[in-house]
Amino acid sequence: MEAKAKELGGGDTPPPTGKVFENTNNVNIPDAGTAVTSSVTVSGISGNAPATLQVGVDIKHTWRGDLVIDLVAPDGSTYRMKSSSSNDSADNVITTYTVNASTEVANGTWKLKVQDVARYDTGYIDSWKLTF
């Protein structure tokens, strides 16, 4: 499912320096299964994506080392943000990755691609966002 852009800011906190595109629809990640994706459609950004594209992810999972996480650009180019690690038994991936996407046109459908590569633990994409 696609999400719409929303501007963040207000109060005493300065607004972010860029425009935020977010998807808050949950996507279940099958245990030791095929990769799943969650999409956001970016529009209204001139030119290419930045060299410091911020990718915020909130993934609930009972063994985060099982997960491989990629950002997929509108042209299909894939940027690996997290590889699997059998030693990482902690829960959840709640972080922001910085991706050099400066060769990519900003506008279009971007995807977060997540795959669980080991058995016994499950989870879901809770939300994710791109900040331009």
Residue map of PLM features:
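Loop and turn regions of beta-sandwich accessory domains that flank beta-strands and are enriched
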Residues: 9-132
